[in-house]
């Protein structure tokens, strides 16, 4: 679609240099302006879609919304605009019909600004978590987000323990989710002197002192 649009823009611009353009000059200029608007709108649209698709499952987590309330509100604003736009597009499909309004481009530009600020806030937040617990640097961004989006579930750390602690294969959880022991990669079980009742955001660091 974008290639076809670019081709049409090039052809329209070429028409403006034809010697016999005079009778059609106004129509050519109008058509070129419309194609340019559609191109800019599609570019902004794709950017919103890409960023929204990445952030939607992250801010779909109540834990992340609780930890990043400002970014959560900004994302919610974009989410409403995005879903409203999709609904309108379903009612009136077609590129020209969907992208002919300058207001839509302005809306997408604003959405992209908000999404950029959300991304920055999220990156800064993850950096503070890594600085507070250096072993989080061993995890990818997606892996760290998996943990932080399930802060009420201590079991969420289990798949990532080997990256954070070379010697730990898994933890032993009681029914009340207290941690009573850890198992090494060699299969050796090491009971704790005292059971731990961790919160994911705070308690994982205590393992380094056991």
Which residue stretches match the model-derived regions?
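Extended amphipathic alpha-helical elements
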Residues: 1-210
């Amino acid at each position: 679609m974008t290639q076809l649009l670019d081709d049409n823009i090039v052809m329209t611009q070429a028409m403006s240099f034809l010697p016999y353009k005079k009778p059609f000059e106004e129509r050519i200029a109008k058509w070129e302006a419309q194609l340019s608007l559609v191109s800019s709108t599609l570019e902004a649209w794709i950017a919103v879609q890409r960023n929204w698709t990445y952030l939607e499952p992250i801010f779909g987590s109540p834990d992340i919304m609780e930890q990043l309330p400002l970014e959560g509100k900004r994302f919610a604003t974009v989410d409403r605009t995005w879903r409203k736009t999709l609904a309108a597009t379903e009612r009136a499909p077609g590129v020209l019909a969907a992208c002919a309004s300058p207001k839509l481009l302005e809306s997408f530009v604003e959405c992209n600004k908000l999404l950029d600020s959300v991304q920055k806030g999220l990156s800064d937040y993850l950096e503070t978590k890594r600085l507070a617990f250096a072993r989080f640097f061993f995890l990818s961004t997606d892996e760290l987000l998996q943990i932080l989006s399930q802060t009420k579930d201590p079991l969420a750390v289990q798949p990532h323990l080997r990256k954070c602690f070379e010697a730990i294969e898994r933890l032993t959880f009681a029914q009340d989710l207290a941690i009573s022991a850890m198992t090494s990669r060699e299969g050796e079980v090491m009971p704790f002197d005292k059971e731990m009742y961790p919160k994911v955001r705070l308690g994982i660091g205590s393992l380094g002192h056991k």
